[in-house]
Regions:
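A diffuse structural propensity rather than consistent per-protein peaks
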Residues: 11, 72, 151, 207, ...
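Residue-level marker of intrinsically disordered, low-complexity segments enriched
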Residues: 28-30, 57, 62-65, 209-210, ...
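Nucleotidyltransferase catalytic core that binds NTPs
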Residues: 1-201
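Acidic, low-complexity, intrinsically disordered interaction modules
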Residues: 235, 244-247
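Proteolytic processing junctions in secreted/extracellular precursors
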Residues: 95, 188, 192-208, 213-215, ...
């Protein structure tokens, strides 16, 4: 079971989903997949930053993987032998919000795509050489600094706007207690995010050529961070058994 995401930052809602998955599928079978791709506005945290956040909440470091594309996670599946792949069911875990972005339409010839929704009773599931499955995790509502916050972007916004006390409380609400190391990471990385946002707001008052050059660099980084494939419809992993693919 692979729980993919960018996690900027990894928060209590993500941890609740991870806990739900471990109870449903077993802790030894669940892995979190994320990347080291960074961009100043939407993806400020490095892979090591996210590992620190996850392990603070109790995720075993051995079950966190640095991958090129979380929604394929070949770095995880490639560790299995051909025999293991023919006997292992592959499940990607997504929130209902994320699942809405995916296209599960049949292939052009009308046959089912590789990925299917996981049956509730799990009856008739096929190994990863034939199909992969999507499990929808429940949405968990929680409060940060006394305010509803159920998305990473909302948490970033709250932290940037908060005062010193607010920031310590946000960290305590996210990770159980104030943490100097996490405070340092959030201050540095979200400080860059705040600076980037302010530059965009003040662009008219700055030298046009410098603004254009800076914005081009930012946009390139943002495009790279957001270019991760999120359409599973025609995914064709290299471990598919061609003879049995459509059966």
């Amino acid at each position: 079971v692979i729980y993919p995401g960018r996690f900027h930052p990894f928060h209590r809602g993500h941890m609740a989903s991870y806990d739900w998955l471990t109870k449903k599928f077993g802790e030894n079978n669940v892995y979190i997949a994320t990347t080291n791709v960074q961009a100043p506005i939407t993806s400020p945290f490095s892979y090591s930053d996210k590992v620190m956040m996850m392990t603070k909440l109790g995720v075993p470091a051995s079950h966190i993987a640095n991958v090129k594309n979380p929604y394929q996670s070949k770095e995880i599946t490639s560790n299995l032998s051909d025999d293991e792949k023919s006997k292992t069911v592959l499940v990607f875990a997504l929130s209902a919000k994320d699942a809405e972005r995916f296209n599960f339409a049949p292939k052009k010839d009308g046959t089912p795509g590789y990925l299917q929704l996981l049956p509730v009773d799990r009856k008739g599931v096929q190994p990863m050489t034939k199909h992969g499955y999507i499990a929808i995790t429940p949405t968990i509502n929680f409060k940060i600094n006394g305010v509803d916050a159920n998305s990473a972007s909302e948490i970033r916004r709250m932290y940037i706007k908060g005062n010193d006390h607010d920031k310590n409380q946000i960290i305590a609400d996210l990770y159980g207690q104030p943490d100097p190391a996490l405070r340092d990471i959030l201050d540095k990385k979200l400080g860059i995010t705040e600076q980037a946002q302010n530059y965009l707001k003040e662009a008219r008052q700055l030298d046009a050529a410098k603004v254009v050059a800076w914005m081009q660099r930012v946009l390139i980084l943002e495009q790279q961070a957001n270019s991760i494939t999120t359409d599973f419809a025609h995914l064709k992993p290299d471990y598919i058994d061609e003879k049995n693919y459509n059966r």
